[in-house]
A protein has these predicted regions:
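Active-site mouth loops of central-metabolism enzymes
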Residues: 10-27, 99-106, 149-155
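N-terminal amphipathic alpha-helix/helix-capping segment at the start of soluble metabolic enzymes
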Residues: 1-27, 200-209
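Catalytic cores of alpha/beta
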Residues: 27-29, 70-82, 105-117, 137-151, ...
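Short, well-ordered coil/turn segments that N-cap beta-strands
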Residues: 11-16, 36-39, 64-68, 79-80, ...
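N-terminal active-site wall of soluble small-molecule enzyme domains
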Residues: 37-95
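Glycine-rich phosphate-binding active-site loops on the catalytic face of alpha/beta enzymes
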Residues: 42-44, 83-93, 119-128, 160-191
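Histidine/lysine/aspartate-rich catalytic loop segments that bind and position anionic ligands
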Residues: 96-134
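Surface-exposed amphipathic alpha-helices with a cationic face
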Residues: 5-9, 54-65, 89-99, 132-145, ...
Length: 209
């Protein structure tokens, strides 16, 4: 497993997360990583074949683990990152250094985030989404004291550009997307980070965490 500080730095510096079924990841994820994915959220749908899923995960760790953070949606699989989706009550971590993320449903989860979580996924299909507005205002993306969060949805490059213009700096693609689209999205976000007035200070902070 990766050491704690490295995991923390990697989630702070992540721009693009992609969500896809774990069983499809062996075929699809290598291309998505080349396209710019920093985090892969691998879903099991709650009906895990633990032996099969563990083998897939270990193979992915072996070949891609230094290039992408691998997140799972279940405590049954040991990974460096775990995401709690709505309705999940079990907050156990896959191992003591693992990062825990939360897919939020209410503004209060953004305004006063639970200290158990190291990052958030904020659903919102448009820049005017109340949850996204709350996230930009209460957790400015490139600030040291903010909880890192991803705008989550089935975005294309055009919608990501619109989100960036309202202050979004990380996206979570719930439908995976094509490699070509991912490359465009990654470039939009890279440019937004470079042009953000908080970027230099945030970068210095993040790499030391």
């Amino acid at each position: 497993m990766t050491v704690m500080h490295s995991l923390r730095s990697r989630i702070l510096l992540a721009r693009v997360a992609v969500q896809l079924p774990l069983v499809e990841a062996g075929d699809r994820l290598p291309g998505l990583v080349l396209g710019g994915a920093d985090v892969a959220v691998l879903t099991t749908g709650g009906a895990a074949d633990r032996r099969r899923d563990l083998k897939i995960l270990r193979d992915l760790e072996r070949y891609l683990g230094q290039r992408v953070l691998l997140a799972v949606d279940t405590p049954e699989l040991e990974a460096d990152v775990r995401v709690l989706f709505p309705g999940e009550q079990d907050r156990s971590r896959p191992h003591q250094w693992a990062l825990l993320g939360q897919a939020v449903q209410e503004q209060r989860q953004i305004v006063e985030p639970d200290g158990a979580f190291q990052f958030l996924a904020v659903p919102g299909s448009s820049p005017g989404s109340p949850l996204l507005r709350a996230a930009v205002e209460n957790q400015p993306p490139l600030r040291r004291d903010s909880v890192p969060w991803f705008a989550a949805g089935g975005f294309d490059a055009g919608s990501v550009q619109a989100l960036v213009e309202t202050g979004v700096r990380r996206v979570w693609l719930t439908e995976g997307g094509t490699v070509e689209e991912l490359e465009q999205i990654d470039e939009i976000l890279r440019r937004a980070w470079r042009e953000d007035p908080d970027y230099e200070d945030y970068l210095g902070f993040a790499v030391q965490e």
